Regions:
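Extracellular/periplasmic bilobal clamshell ligand-binding domains
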Residues: 126-165
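Soluble non-cytosolic domains of exported or imported proteins
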Residues: 6, 25-28, 43, 89-93, ...
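Mature extracytoplasmic/periplasmic domains
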Residues: 82-141
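Residues that form or immediately flank small-molecule/cofactor binding pockets and catalytic motifs
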Residues: 29, 70-73, 116
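Short beta-strand->loop
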Residues: 59-78, 87-89
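Non-transmembrane alpha-helical segments in soluble domains
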Residues: 12, 31, 35, 43, ...
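Ligand-binding pocket segment of bilobal, Venus flytrap-like solute-binding proteins
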Residues: 1-68
Length: 165
């Protein structure tokens, strides 16, 4: 979205051609691949880093890993979000109450502490260990509605170049 469709297609082709292996596995598998020297760099969600720190078997994999945040000289790193919506629900009012609870300060503190994710409620801070890792990083402020408008284009490009193949 920041550079245009032509740039994105060229970038994705170069990324695919530079992969150490066909895309596979989950976030933990990507870190394990670095540890096993299958690749030098992988993409994953930051909160898995913290989950792995608390697992003695996986903690050793982190000896070869350092979280980095790309695009720091420009628009910053993309941040995933967790979303929630109500669709065809007979209990609409209770659903709204549940969403309001999930967004509350108390629930967001639980979420941030349990998962090491960024809370959406501005009254709640991320955990100190998350803040220490992301210290100084900038994050992409692109409106998610705008970002979502590129989904079809992105999917078409990924299919066109057979990214997963």
């Amino acid at each position: 979205a920041h550079h245009g469709e032509e740039w994105f297609e060229d970038y994705i082709i170069k990324l695919k051609n530079n992969l150490a292996r066909r895309p596979q596995g989950n976030d933990r598998d990507q870190v394990k691949a670095i540890y096993a020297r299958v690749c030098d760099l992988s993409i994953g969600n930051h909160y898995y880093y913290f989950k792995m720190l608390s697992d003695e078997n996986q903690k050793v994999w982190l000896e070869k890993v350092k979280p980095i945040f790309p695009n720091q000289d420009s628009y910053g790193t993309h941040v995933n979000i967790s979303g929630i919506t109500i669709i065809n629900n007979q209990n609409y009012d209770q659903s709204v109450d549940f969403i309001e609870f999930l967004l509350s300060e108390g629930a967001q503190k639980i979420y941030a502490n349990a998962n090491n994710e960024f809370p959406i409620n501005p009254q709640v801070s991320a955990t100190q260990k998350v803040l220490d890792v992301v210290k100084g990083a900038s994050f992409d402020s692109m409106d998610l509605t705008e970002m979502a408008s590129y989904r079809k284009t992105v999917m078409n490009i990924l299919q066109k170049i057979n990214f997963d193949g």
